[in-house]
């Protein structure tokens, strides 16, 4: 039962001394697909088709850097003794919450420079972000990482999973929870929900609901994982950040409705976001 017949090599192919990993390919596919999805919403909103190019470029770049910095900070005892490992990103070690923080800051700065409404842009890209995250989790599967605790093969079979997933969750003589799959399904479900309800939401609420939906799923799924970044022996960083994001997002939705009463996106089949700045 422990023999893996369909083991997936994390390396897709080699270009001379360079190994191209499935992880990087899948992340790139997620970003590109998210970009094309956002472009459709961008056109409906009446913005120029090139509006997102700089935003996505700088958000992806600084998000990636921040994701690495975030991981290193919470694993500092190891990296303090092995500083040369900090730049060796190919050895693994990025954190999605760090990426979200870095990408968010970069995106807001670009919006301000280009005189764009960050709430409007956030609403446009939110479904794309969670879709890209759902796709990106399959990169963890290819790397045989970010899995949950030990389970039996019988448990995995009861989930009616394809054999290639079951067999590749057999790592170091043990089967594990496919937490990558749980989160991928949760994220794709979030994408479907957001694209179907955003025209009924007010300015900024699609983005805040994205943060809320993602954080709820991440909180519970994180509890199953074995590789969590820990703040203390009992507190997982991702769970703490998820709680904070849920509270902040819901509070901002309520606050903005009371304080500003932003416009409602009510036109059926359209995304009538204003192109002027809205508080």
UniProtKB/Swiss-Prot annotation:
It is a multi-pass membrane protein. Its EC number is 2.5.1.145. Pathway: Protein modification; lipoprotein biosynthesis (diacylglyceryl transfer). It is found in: Cell membrane. The chain crosses the membrane at residues 18-38, 55-75, 89-109, 203-223, 235-255. A 1,2-diacyl-sn-glycero-3-phospho-(1'-sn-glycerol) binds at residue 137. Its main location: membrane. Pfam families: LGT. GO terms for cellular component: plasma membrane. Belongs to the Lgt family. Catalyzes the transfer of the diacylglyceryl group from phosphatidylglycerol to the sulfhydryl group of the N-terminal cysteine of a prolipoprotein, the first step in the formation of mature lipoproteins. This is Phosphatidylglycerol--prolipoprotein diacylglyceryl transferase. It comes from Staphylococcus aureus (strain bovine RF122 / ET3-1). The gene is lgt.
């Amino acid at each position: 039962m422990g023999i893996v017949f369909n083991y997936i090599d994390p390396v897709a192919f080699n270009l001379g001394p360079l190994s191209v990993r499935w992880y990087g390919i899948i992340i790139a596919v997620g970003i590109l697909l998210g970009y094309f999805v956002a472009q459709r919403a961008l056109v409906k909103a009446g913005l120029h088709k090139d509006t997102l190019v700089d935003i996505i470029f700088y958000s992806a770049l600084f998000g990636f850097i921040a994701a690495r910095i975030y991981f290193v900070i919470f694993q500092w005892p190891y990296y303090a003794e092995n500083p040369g490992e900090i730049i060796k990103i190919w050895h693994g070690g990025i954190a999605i919450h760090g990426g979200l923080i870095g990408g968010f800051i970069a995106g807001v700065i670009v919006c301000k420079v280009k005189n764009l409404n960050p709430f409007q842009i956030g609403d446009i890209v939110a479904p794309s972000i969670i879709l890209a995250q759902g796709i990106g989790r399959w990169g963890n599967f290819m790397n045989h990482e970010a899995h949950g605790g030990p389970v039996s093969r019988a448990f995995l079979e009861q989930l009616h999973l394809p054999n290639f997933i079951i067999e590749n969750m057999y790592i170091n003589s043990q089967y594990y929870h496919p937490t990558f799959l749980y989160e991928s399904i949760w994220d794709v479900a979030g994408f479907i929900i957001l694209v179907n309800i955003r025209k009924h939401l007010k300015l900024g609420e699609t983005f805040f609901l994205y943060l809320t939906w993602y954080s709820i799923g991440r909180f519970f799924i994180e509890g199953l994982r074995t590789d969590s970044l820990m703040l203390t022996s009992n507190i997982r960083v991702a769970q703490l950040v998820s709680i904070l994001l849920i509270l902040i997002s819901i509070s901002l939705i309520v606050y903005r409705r009371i304080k500003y009463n932003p416009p409602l996106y009510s036109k059926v089949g359209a995304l009538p976001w204003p192109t002027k700045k809205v508080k």
